[in-house]
A protein has these predicted regions:
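Extended, intrinsically disordered, low-complexity segments
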Residues: 3-46, 297-356
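Alpha/beta enzyme core
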Residues: 25-296, 302-303, 309, 313, ...
Length: 356
């Protein structure tokens, strides 16, 4: 799918972004050798994602930005904007159900979202596997099912299940009930499993990849809550087990970010949550620090909340003042949701259609 013509171009050019194809450009030549394959059964999108990540890892002027989407339309818009990958994050997907990211979403619901997104996009799709939904055998099944659904990558973390504890406190000064809630791994009260259980999860994920369909494996640790040594010890063991990339969650500042990259010998992820615990740096700054990728878990969720609320306020105001405001033209909305492709398809198969 082509990127948005009139939008801002993606600032980091990745030579490995192109998908290998046959000379006529209509089908993929399965005889073409895929680069950077790690699974028993090669997968084009996993190969492409891994190649992009390694390219960015080896070039401090590049970084792979993972904008976290939540459904087919938002994912397609991410691709149309020129981003090289789509990330179905647990926080964003849970929000599409009107729920917080606290373990409500099950594996099959994520698989459904993966299939929905893969049908709507052509770039690699990373998917959030959370804790793997149970024992190491559940982790293995999660990775296998995500790969079968079309995911190019999966993230597995070492938080406990249920994922988070929430602490409610009564504020006498404010006179209301408030909860200590933030987002994703920046949530207060989170806890992690033991090293042994964390390693078993990651080993199960790697085994699923090595014994089956190839898939990029990102291992995440939230163990920074127990100190630097604990987090890096886990990250290094994840690396030894054989993951493709590591994500140490909630690194506070540039110094910690640089140290993390220097102490690991594989692609690393950064996580930018506006207003979160991590210093809010530009993608270019993160690339210079040595990160291969950066994720934006709730940028689109925040945009959705604000835009819908603002639009509803505008609609209410218009009810006593005149016609409702035109946000987008009719044809632009139809094109945005895919009607133009439907009309082209109908035309090509020779069916009668009334073009509006």
């Amino acid at each position: 799918m082509s990127s948005q013509k009139d939008g801002v171009p993606y600032p980091f050019q990745l030579s490995s972004k192109a998908v290998p194809s046959s000379t006529n450009g209509t089908t993929v030549d399965l005889n073409l050798p895929l680069k950077n394959v790690r699974g028993r059964i090669p997968a084009i999108q996993a190969s492409q994602l891994r190649s992009m990540m390694l390219e960015a890892y080896n070039d401090p002027s590049k970084i792979v930005a993972h904008v976290c989407s939540y459904d087919g339309l938002s994912s397609r818009l991410v691709e149309e904007a020129g981003f090289p990958v789509v990330f179905l994050a647990g926080y964003a997907v849970a929000s599409s159900y009107g729920l917080p990211d606290t373990g409500y979403i099950a594996m099959q619901e994520m698989c459904n979202k993966i299939q929905e997104t893969v049908r709507m996009t052509s770039v690699p799709v990373m998917a959030d596997g959370d804790t793997g939904y149970g024992s190491p055998m559940n982790v293995k099944r999660t990775v296998e099912c995500f790969a079968a659904a079309g995911a190019a990558g999966v993230m597995i973390e070492d938080q406990t299940w249920p994922k988070r504890k929430f602490y409610l406190s009564w504020s006498k000064i404010e006179g209301n009930l408030s909860s200590a809630v933030a987002g994703c791994g920046h949530t207060k009260g989170k806890s992690v499993v033991s090293r042994g259980e964390a390693y078993a999860r990651v080993q199960a994920a790697v085994d699923a990849r090595n014994q089956g369909q190839d898939i990029f494996i990102l291992a995440r640790t939230d163990a920074l809550i127990h100190g630097w040594d604990e987090a890096i010890t886990r990250a290094r063991e994840f690396e030894r087990i054989g993951v493709d990339a590591v994500f140490v969650e909630a690194l506070p500042d540039r110094q910690a970010m640089r140290r993390c990259v220097e102490e690991l010998q594989l692609p690393t992820f950064a996580n930018i949550i506006e207003g979160g615990k991590t210093e809010n740096l530009s993608a270019s700054d993160l690339a210079q620090l040595g990160f291969a990728a950066v994720a934006y878990p709730w940028t689109l969720v925040a945009a959705k909340l604000k835009s819908i609320r603002d639009t509803l306020d505008g609609l209410k105001l218009s009810m006593t003042r005149g016609a409702p405001p035109v946000i987008l033209g009719y044809s632009e909305v139809c094109k945005g949701v895919g009607f133009h492709k439907y009309w082209v398809g109908i035309f090509l198969i020779g069916a009668d259609i009334l073009l509006i």
